[in-house]
């Protein structure tokens, strides 16, 4: 699936209500999640209730990014679907691609991604805190 969104993509079948969440999102912003379903199956909506995903491409609007991330986690763990993408849709129709930003999910290794707070040795090679107790040196230095 490309990093652009097709707004004519079919939505999952959902018989319930979002509790007014999307009415407020129409004047501010809303989020869209897209994925490719392997078959028609029921899934739990982040807003409550269940919906039936379609076989093939699906597009679902939600009011919060956290709801999209929760649904993405469910798609990944229960349905083994890893091609979901999250977009921010502004009221003027502008669409911004959000997740995964560089095409690789945060928990995966990406050759171009800089490591943050990483130590180049195993935990067994950590310094003993007693050895540096009365020195002006921290255990993480």
UniProtKB/Swiss-Prot annotation:
GO terms for cellular component: chloroplast thylakoid membrane; photosystem I reaction center. Its main location: plastid. The keyword Ion transport does not apply. The keyword Chloroplast applies. SUPFAM superfamilies: Photosystem I subunit PsaD. It is a peripheral membrane protein. It comes from the Eukaryota. Transmembrane segments: none annotated. One of its GO terms (biological process) is photosynthesis. Keywords: Chloroplast, Membrane, Photosynthesis, Photosystem I, Plastid, Thylakoid. It is found in: Plastid, Chloroplast thylakoid membrane. PsaD can form complexes with ferredoxin and ferredoxin-oxidoreductase in photosystem I (PS I) reaction center. PANTHER family: PHOTOSYSTEM I REACTION CENTER SUBUNIT II, CHLOROPLASTIC, PHOTOSYSTEM I REACTION CENTER SUBUNIT II-1, CHLOROPLASTIC-RELATED. Belongs to the PsaD family. This is Photosystem I reaction center subunit II. It comes from Pyropia yezoensis. The gene is psaD.
């Amino acid at each position: 699936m490309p990093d652009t969104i097709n707004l004519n993509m079919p939505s999952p079948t959902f018989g319930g209500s979002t509790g007014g969440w999307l009415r407020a999102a129409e004047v501010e912003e809303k989020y869209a999640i897209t994925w490719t379903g392997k078959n028609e199956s029921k899934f739990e909506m982040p807003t409550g209730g269940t919906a039936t995903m379609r076989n093939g491409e699906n597009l679902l609007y939600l009011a919060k990014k956290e709801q999209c991330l929760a649904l993405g986690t469910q798609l990944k763990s229960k349905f083994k679907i890893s091609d979901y993408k999250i977009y921010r849709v502004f009221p003027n129709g502008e669409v911004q691609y959000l997740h995964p930003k560089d095409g690789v999910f945060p928990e995966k290794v990406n050759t171009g991604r800089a490591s943050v707070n990483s130590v180049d040795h195993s935990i067994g090679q950590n310094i003993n805190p007693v050895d540096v107790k009365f020195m002006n040196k921290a255990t993480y230095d």
